[in-house]
Amino acid sequence: FYGVAEREGDESLVRTGCIPAGSASAEAADAIEQAVLGFEDAMHRFEFHRALGVCDAFLRGANKRWSDASKAAKAAGTEDPARGDDLMTQALVDAFAELRVATVLMHGVVPRGCELICEYFDIAPEAFFSWDHVLETTDEFVRALGEEPGSHRVKVLPPRFDFFAY
């Protein structure tokens, strides 16, 4: 959420307050699919420990992808701001896709924190937590909400906000 937050004086093209349009990278899309299928399989078998393990591995991988991609974007942006914006846009597309799916997967375990994430996505919970949309790309999901990709605004997140500290 902080990555797209509008900042006065920041000329970055990614700071629109909206989830950026675009397709998740092949690595992120594959991780999403594997996590959803693995989680679904584990839950079907009532292997809750395995389902949580799938989520843990997915979240750790998503965090590493975000860390690596955002650092690369910042480094590239010092020499070529347009290239930095392109890389940051892709990092954000991946991060929002992975966060949405992780939130759906973890909703049964930590409902309050996940519902707070949904609130800051500014999407109705009925749509956000629907398994009908879990494997859709973010662009497909935003279109299903009746909006154009790249135009869905998220709520402004307060500084140092923790969704799970309650």
Residue ranges and their predicted role:
Residues 1-87:
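Long, charged, mostly alpha-helical binding arms that flank functional sites
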Residues 46, 56-166:
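Basic, alpha-helical terminal appendages of large translation-related enzymes
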